[in-house]
Amino acid sequence: MRYLPLTDTDRSEMLSVVGASSIDDLFVDVPKEARLDGPIRDLPMHASEMAVEKHMRARAAKNLVAGDVPFFLGAGAYRHHVPASVDHIIQRGEFLTAYTPYQPEIAQGTLQMLFEFQTQVAKLYGCEVANASMYDGSTACWEAISMASRVTKRNRAVLSGALHPHYSEVAKTMAKYLGLEIADAQPAIQAAPDNAGLTSRIDENTSCVVVQYPDILGRIADLTEIAEAAHAKGALLIVVNTEPVALGAIKSPGEMGADIVVGEGQSLGVGLQFGGPYLGLFAVRDKKHVRQMPGRLCGETVDAEGKRGFVLTLSTREQHIRREKATSNICTNSGLCALAFSVHMTLLGEVGLRRLAAENHRLACLTADRLAKVPGVTVLNDTFFNEFTIQVGQDAREIVRTLADKGVLAGVSLGRLYPDVERLSDALIVATTETTSEDDIEALGSALEEVLA
């Protein structure tokens, strides 16, 4: 069959259906300075492959690469060491595919991998059931809010002010078109989360309360009180975790009464990768809610001969069967990233994960102690895992830029995450992992002393 490209008439009809007057209207959300409106600058129209590679390598050399400089960026994406065996396994031909395993008779390897992944996530989160992954943490968070609305038959979600703002923005964007109310807030710059203020916002119309653990400022708090307050009003507690390594050291959300636990799985097995692809994790504490869960579910069964096998189960929830009545519009899963996560978790084991978590926390404590000695720096947190917030007494965005020029990636400024909230502009989120050396910590402390002098 010959391929027939779109005609101008086809394009006009499609634009008319979606209410756009031109192709440019489809990209109005992309800032003009980020759009390519002509040939790539500094690159000739025609060049050999070798010349293009040389040019692009020269451009790439201007980047500050995480492994080459002291690196303290976090705020939802973390640099951890990924064993070489992870990449080796996920690149095997049996796994390196975008195919969804609808036919169990030819996909037992993939299905078993997904089943093992679900088991690991459920245990990590302290839940009974986990799905076979989602796109990333922010979309998993939204799907949890949507699920809570279906379960409770309510449409108001209360978001903690200490939830990552990118997660809040995704939720608000989706809710805008689906008739749900998102009650969000801004973070309070204080040593401990304001649990009392959060619980006071719960009412009889609330479908769920969404909290982050550890939160955007790195703080850790017992969530039992919030769970009890939510349940007393008939609402669900959704807990977001952006750093799964933390759960090797702190209590799981399910143990504290969370009904739905979601998060970002990038820390285990998946590199930073310029922001993606990442890995959404999704689990529920009580399997009575399983039919309202989004995404794929892989189950264990026996075949006609009584042999153990794996299949996609409860598929009537899904888009390929229920279409517009499906529990979500997710029509595949981040299978390869899920495999990377599962391989890394398996290589670590329970003891290895706890040791990794302990090392992350140890280095964070060393970093906090060093920065507390810098004149003009205040360490905000009473509690933290591998990430904490400092106040530097001036615009932290400028501090980050200045230190980047000195070859130190100092952290993520709250001013970058909340550009319209002036009172947050002097706060800087600093993250450490097992890849952080004591020399890196000293480099950050010395650079801050020089800049703040």
Curated annotation (Swiss-Prot):
Domain of life: Bacteria
Reaction catalysed by this enzyme: N(6)-[(R)-lipoyl]-L-lysyl-[glycine-cleavage complex H protein] + glycine + H(+) = N(6)-[(R)-S(8)-aminomethyldihydrolipoyl]-L-lysyl-[glycine-cleavage complex H protein] + CO2
Keyword Oxidoreductase: yes
Listed EC numbers: 1.4.4.2
InterPro entries attached to this UniProt entry: GcvPA, GDC-P_N, GDC_P, PyrdxlP-dep_Trfase, PyrdxlP-dep_Trfase_major, PyrdxlP-dep_Trfase_small
MF terms in GO: glycine dehydrogenase (decarboxylating) activity
Keywords linked to the UniProt accession: Oxidoreductase
Pfam families registered for this protein in UniProt: GDC-P
Gene Ontology terms: biological process: glycine decarboxylation via glycine cleavage system; nucleoside metabolic process
HAMAP family in UniProt: GcvPA (MF_00712)
Role of this protein: The glycine cleavage system catalyzes the degradation of glycine. The P protein binds the alpha-amino group of glycine through its pyridoxal phosphate cofactor; CO(2) is released and the remaining methylamine moiety is then transferred to the lipoamide cofactor of the H protein.
Quaternary context: The glycine cleavage system is composed of four proteins: P, T, L and H. In this organism, the P 'protein' is a heterodimer of two subunits.
Family recorded in the similarity comment: Belongs to the GcvP family. N-terminal subunit subfamily.
Entry protein name: Probable glycine dehydrogenase (decarboxylating) subunit 1
Annotated organism of origin: Erythrobacter litoralis (strain HTCC2594)
Biological classification of the source: Bacteria, Pseudomonadati, Pseudomonadota, Alphaproteobacteria, Sphingomonadales
